[in-house]
Amino acid sequence: MNRMLLPAAVIAAFLAQPVLAHEDDAAAGSGQGQFGKVNFPTSCSAAVQPQFERAVAMLHSFFFPEHIKAFQAVIKADPGCAMAYWGLAISQRGNPLVPPWPEESLKRALEAIQQGKAVAKTERERDWLNALEAVYRDYDKVPTSTRSQRYEQAMAELARKYPDDKEASIFYALALLEAVDHADKTYARQLKAGGILEPIDKQQPAHPGLAHYIIHTYDFEPLAERGVAAADKYAKVAPSAPHAQHMPSHIYSILGRWEDSIRSNTAAVKASRDYAAKNAPGTTFSQEPHAQDFMAYAYLQLGQDREARRVTGELGAIAKYSGARSYGRDTGAIAPASRYVLERAAWSEAATLAVPPDLYTYAEAIPRFTRAVGAAKTGNPGMAKGEIERLQALSKSAENSYWAEQVQVLVLAASAWRAQAEGRKDDALKLMRGAADLEDSTEKHVSMENRLYPMREMLGDLLLELGQPAAALQAYEASLHVAQNRLHGFYGAAKAAQAAGDRGKARAYFEKLAALAKNADTDRAELREAKAFLLAQR
């Protein structure tokens, strides 16, 4: 085959690849929208270079499937643009931080890489394609985690070989984040990524990938303050990307900045709906549920239960999606209904919560856990046992060891409430401590951004029930250190302090609760109790 030319049939095959959305690529190819500024030199024709860089900018904001359309448009205009095939290949993982991905997408990625190599004009472009191949090669035999580490090493070498190629450094930082070990409490890869990204961000403040990946880098409680500046600017850098509107709330949610989280996700939902209305009328864009989950969680912390209920109703009414299915879509669509009953301690509702079919493992585990706790809390440990058995089966069949462990956290906590319902108090406490310790030993996953419920806070609830208020207060305070500004966390700490005879702390926590829920839209019992306590202290 001529290295500079591809048969027309091959080019047509790539241009015909499915993108899981409406096939009108006018928006992708016309230059509409604002996605930030990227400088990525290639050997492609001068005519398509701006189009290619715009496609990369969209890629940096995970605007799937639009970035696929954009790279296809570049190939159509310049079939010899090797890096457009690289773009098409890397785009097959809509969000590279959230596996798994369909095997047919991984296969298409490898095919695109080979076609890119066939037309590559420079050693640098071949090196880019070879590095990317590391994450796709043997996808049907080698686990994702192994391939991610392989890709991390390949991108490290690329960045070392081309120190002036800032995109190589940026994608190396993203490769580090793809390979993060969620049990590593030293945050070694995250800190390394931050050290790469932050200096470049000062040089290229309008680059969408820098703000985006800095947020992901510091999307962990001990690091979150470092991500505030990136969070505050990202939506302005890429205002046309729905994901860019949502991402700041990753930092805001960790820090308990609920109004800011709601603001970000309101914009993200609007952007998602505008996109769906234009590109796939009658569908819900697949990125919307993740944003809605953040929004529901934030509303519940503010005592705005009606707004949270509105969100759960909208999610329950979704009939058809556009865009790719993902772990984040499933958990985002499912979690708010469970949050709505768990945060309100609506145990009868929890016990009867529906379990939709055809979900990723942890997404199915969410309502199963909620039903188990609801059953135990309403005096039906037999039903709780059945749901716990289903959770155990889910843990065994999970997509990988991380999700198996996260489901096991739910197994332990649900088993604790079942033991409590059966009067086995020592067992209950041991199981709940196990759940809290296991959860604390790992980090949350980007596709389940806000943990379903802080298990150390739940340990506080159990200790309070068992008449151990001092220990309960310790548990609540430890939980609030990690899960900041939570309404029930403040309430539990206030009740525990009150029961332990520490009226000063009780007052402080009730004051925090009252301030947090000052704009509550329902008459929460916790808020009534806080107001009554504070009134009596005057």
Predicted feature residues:
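TPR/TPR-like (Sel1-like) alpha-helical repeat modules
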Residues: 82, 89, 93, 101-118, ...
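Residue at a conserved register position within TPR or TPR-like alpha-solenoid repeats
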Residues: 58, 92, 134, 176, ...
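Solenoid-like repeat scaffolds
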Residues: 76, 159-161, 201-203, 233-240, ...
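Alpha-solenoid helical repeat scaffolds
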Residues: 52, 83-87, 170, 212-213, ...
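Amphipathic alpha-helical repeat scaffolds of TPR domains
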Residues: 46-54, 82-95, 120-140, 164-182, ...
